[in-house]
Amino acid sequence: MIHHMKLHQEPFESIKKGVKTIELRLYDEKRQVLKSGDMIDFTSPHGERICVKVVKLHIFNSFQELYERLPLDKCGYDDVSQAKPEDMEMYYSKAEQAKYGVVGIEIALFDP
């Protein structure tokens, strides 16, 4: 199955370069249908597209738990010492996180 998601330019470029291999999202209805082996078509703000394969889903109750368990350099942080779960509150409220949980989507560039 192919899923479509939007990305800000910086994480888009990091995925394109193969540096970021875990995308962090709310585990809402849209992400709950993801499965290993599915494809994600990411679109940047400039309309660029990149296709990746879902390798594994890492599901947690909160970004706090996710940040303690996953390698943050693979989640898009250049300086992991500055990484904090509160960074994700600019995208997802604490109420949304409590309602749905969160997911680290482990991905690999897709080369057809």
Kindly give the residue locations of the regions a language model identified.
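Contiguous surface segments at macromolecular interaction interfaces
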Residues: 14, 66-112
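Short beta-strand-centered aromatic/proline hotspots
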Residues: 49-59
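A generic structural motif
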Residues: 58-61, 111
